[in-house]
UniProtKB/Swiss-Prot annotation:
Superkingdom field: Eukaryota
Entries under CDD domains matching the protein: ATP-synt_Fo_a_6 (cd00310)
Role description: Key component of the proton channel; it plays a direct role in the translocation of protons across the membrane.
Main location as per UniProt: plastid
Protein name as annotated: ATP synthase subunit a, chloroplastic
Record GO terms (molecular function): proton-transporting ATP synthase activity, rotational mechanism
Transmembrane spans: 82-102, 121-141, 177-199, 211-231
Family annotation (PROSITE patterns): ATPASE_A
Lineage of the species this protein comes from: Eukaryota, Rhodophyta, Bangiophyceae, Galdieriales, Galdieriaceae
Assembly: F-type ATPases have 2 components, CF(1) - the catalytic core - and CF(0) - the membrane proton channel. CF(1) has five subunits: alpha(3), beta(3), gamma(1), delta(1), epsilon(1). CF(0) has four main subunits: a, b, b' and c.
One Gene Ontology cellular component annotation held by this UniProt entry: proton-transporting ATP synthase complex
Ion transport in keyword set: yes
Coiled coil: none
Amino acid sequence: MLISSVKVGEHFYFTLGVFKLHAQVFIVSFFVILILILFSVLGTNKMSQTPRGLQNFLEYVLEFIQDITKSQIGEPHYRDWVPFIGTLFLFIFVSNWSGALIPWKMIILPEGELSAPTNDINTTAALALLTSLAYFYAGISKKGLRYFSRYIKPTPILLPINILEDFTKPLSLSFRLFGNILADELVVSVLTLLVPLIVPLPVMMLGLFASSIQALIFATLAAAYIGEAIEEH
């Protein structure tokens, strides 16, 4: 066995003008976006005062997202952030489930293989950076330049620690989501090779549960950071 001949981290790229794009992430991300758009169109196509079927399900999802946002941000600001928190939650949720349910690895690519977008550190880092920009925007739009006074509270001695905290938030968000989804897919792949008929199903169910929890944690923390930024001390 020639261990040195094994190539790690192969990716499939395509070029768009001067840009080199990560095709594996883009393909599955567009699939996830199409799924979300399709559900939205079908659920709101023939809306009625008495919701049923898909409309009823979508209204339940919206209420769930509103509850998350309201509990972390509070009145009266939470309504402005429901679309952002909802977009984060739904994209991560559907991405995670697509990685657990759809056999992406059966699709042959020139290089690399398809997987959930959240299985790529670039995706989770981008989502975490968007969250950071969101809570900076929330704080500055609410307080103006007074927002930056929080770095010297309760004492200026804590200035380095408070600055470091803004760097650790996106790091923890991105690596937590990436690590959990990557580990789940690796476990399912290995067990499928070892015991293809018995073990993978319960492990897959556990993976779906863990994937849902990770989407909830990410959305809740994003809302909590925004609520912290606009909170008056």
